Curated annotation (Swiss-Prot):
This is one of the proteins that bind and probably mediate the attachment of the 5S RNA into the large ribosomal subunit, where it forms part of the central protuberance. It comes from Nostoc punctiforme (strain ATCC 29133 / PCC 73102). This is Large ribosomal subunit protein uL18. The gene is rplR. Residues 1-22 are annotated as: Disordered. The keyword Coiled coil does not apply. Belongs to the universal ribosomal protein uL18 family. Keywords: Ribonucleoprotein, Ribosomal protein, RNA-binding, rRNA-binding. It comes from the Bacteria. PANTHER family: 39S RIBOSOMAL PROTEIN L18, MITOCHONDRIAL, LARGE RIBOSOMAL SUBUNIT PROTEIN UL18M.
Length: 120
C-alpha cells in the first residue's frame, strides 16, 4: 500500500532525528514548516534546551512580510536565526530539516543562515 504524504514525512523525520544530535559545541538548527509560517530553533539536545528561536510570527518580521509562507519569509528567518545565534556565540550548528525535503523554503532558510555566518 502506498504511503500518504504525512506518513512519508513522519518516516523521514524519524530517520533524520535518529542521525542528527545537537551538542553544546554544535547545537541543532531545527526547522519546522507549516502551510502558513516557518519556524527555526537552535537546540542543545544534551540539556534539552532551546538556545535561540525565530519565526515568521515575530512582530518585527510579520509587519514587513507579505506572507509567512514563501521563500522571502524563509530568507528573513534564516538571517534572523543566524544573527541571534552569533550574538550568543554559536557559529557551528547541525542542520535538522525535520521531515521536510531540502528544497524550496527549507533550503532558502539554510542558505540565508549560511550567508549570515552560521557554519554547517
Amino acid at each position: 500500500m502506498k504511503l500518504t504524504r504525512r506518513e512519508s514525512k513522519n518516516r523521514r523525520h524519524r530517520r533524520v532525528r535518529g542521525k542528527v544530535v545537537g551538542s553544546p559545541e554544535r547545537p541543532r538548527l531545527a526547522v519546522f514548516r507549516s502551510n502558513e509560517h516557518i519556524y527555526a530553533q537552535v537546540i542543545d539536545d544534551s540539556q534539552h534546551q532551546t538556545i535561540v528561536a525565530a519565526s515568521t510570527l515575530e512582530p518585527e518580521l510579520k509587519s514587513s512580510l507579505a506572507s509567512g509562507a514563501n521563500r522571502d519569509a524563509s530568507v528573513q528567518v534564516g538571517k534572523l536565526i543566524a544573527v541571534r545565534s552569533l550574538e550568543k556565540g554559536i557559529t557551528k550548528v547541525v542542520f535538522d530539516r525535520g521531515g521536510n525535503l531540502y528544497h524550496g523554503r527549507v533550503k532558502a532558510l539554510a542558505d540565508a543562515a549560511r550567508e549570515a555566518g552560521l557554519d554547517f
